[in-house]
Amino acid sequence: SFIGATTLMIAHGLTSSLLFCLANTNYERVHSRTMALARGLQTLLPLAATWWLLASLTNLALPPTINLIGELSVMMAAFSWSHLTIILVGLNTLITALYSLYMLIMTQRGKYTYHINNIMPPFTRENTLMIMHLFPLILLSTNPKLIMGTMYCKYSLNKTLDCESNN
């Protein structure tokens, strides 16, 4: 559906941008793009590890994120178009989930490597940037009608009085 694709595009844009910002903060501290060299940062940078966890969970499209609402809308539209597309969409979802978990584990867990010393904590501007990415995601997750409009009422699991008055 058009609304589902729009929802997914907005959610993907915010989530991907957040993940790229986090990758850049890792690069600025480790000076390498290799994930194996950036492992173990959770013990050194706990706040950055929290940002990584929230970004990965959003990328996984876990409830109640806006990513889940967009993915479910697109999946329903694709499945109604052709029953074979559910296989492709399912594989895509599985690969995305596996890579997101792999990325989180490789960069945050484990013992940090020998070349990491004197790691600077995240700056205020970096934390502000992460909040500026997460705030719209949380806002859209708590109120999907901002994107979906009246289509949210049509596909909502819980029909509220607000939806009844609009129809």
Swiss-Prot record:
GO terms for molecular function: NADH dehydrogenase (ubiquinone) activity; ubiquinone binding. It is an enzyme of class 7 (translocase). It catalyses: a ubiquinone + NADH + 5 H(+)(in) = a ubiquinol + NAD(+) + 4 H(+)(out). GO terms for biological process: ATP synthesis coupled electron transport; electron transport coupled proton transport. Belongs to the complex I subunit 4 family. It is found in: Mitochondrion membrane. Keywords: Electron transport, Membrane, Mitochondrion, NAD, Respiratory chain, Translocase, Transmembrane, Transmembrane helix, Transport, Ubiquinone. Core subunit of the mitochondrial membrane respiratory chain NADH dehydrogenase (Complex I) that is believed to belong to the minimal assembly required for catalysis. Complex I functions in the transfer of electrons from NADH to the respiratory chain. The immediate electron acceptor for the enzyme is believed to be ubiquinone. This is NADH-ubiquinone oxidoreductase chain 4. Its main location: mitochondrion. GO terms for cellular component: mitochondrial membrane. InterPro entries: NADH_UbQ_OxRdtase (IPR003918), ND/Mrp_TM (IPR001750). The chain crosses the membrane at residues 2-22, 44-64, 86-106. Its EC number is 7.1.1.2. It is a multi-pass membrane protein.
